[in-house]
Amino acid sequence: MSYRMSRSRVFGALGAAGLLALPACSSGTHPPAAVTTSAPAASAGTTSPAAPVTSVRIGRFTQEFATPLPADQAQAKIIEGWREAQILWSKSLIAWRLVPGVTGYVTGVARTHLLGAISYGKQNDAVPAGADRMFMTSVTSVAPTAATITTCDDGSRFAEVNPKTGTVNQAFATPADHQYLYETWHMVPVGGHWAIGSFTLATLPAAAARHCQP
């Protein structure tokens, strides 16, 4: 889930809103994302040992998409919009501002949460670092004006650091029962592509989160 601020902070804020819902290292600038594809080492939760992983490097943070795009072109376009939204979300957290293009891919309630995450990160000198892996990702419903994506999210290597020093802030460490999440992303068409409109998440002990655990 690349919705980032401190995960525990996200859970608290979204829980208070009745959602338990989500997402997506230097102030003012953001380097271009480096996209690579490689075969992952065998690890818990991967759909197949040979499944390629698309990795997007953004500053100190790496977003991994472990599930290949679906063969169905309509579904692939939905996933592509979701991936772009995740990347722009993370870039915005690193830049502490909405970066160009993000408002076209993150809208509605999701954008409200992104703005809150940006504000929180700036106030606490924290930006995403480490890595986050989305796996078992699929389009579960499609309609002309809405689509739904579900995914598992491995945040076991995710951290938050001070962008000036690179020091990991242990106060924002992710609790063990929040490292592997089950997420539902509600997508809407915007300007010829798909964008994130809202999202929800499940953590242990919720049944939905159990199949995402290592």
Ranges and model annotations:
Residues 2-15:
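Bacterial N-terminal signal peptides that target proteins for export
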Residues 21-24:
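C-terminal motif of bacterial Sec signal peptides marking the signal peptidase cleavage site
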Residues 26-29:
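Bacterial signal peptide processing site
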Residues 32-55:
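Extracellular mucin-like PTS domains
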Residues 53-130:
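Core segments of small alpha/beta cavity-forming domains
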Residues 57, 61, 205-214:
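Short, low-complexity, Pro/Ser/Thr/Gly-rich segments in the mature regions of secreted, periplasmic
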Residues 97-211:
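Structured, amphipathic secondary-structure segments that form assembly/contact surfaces
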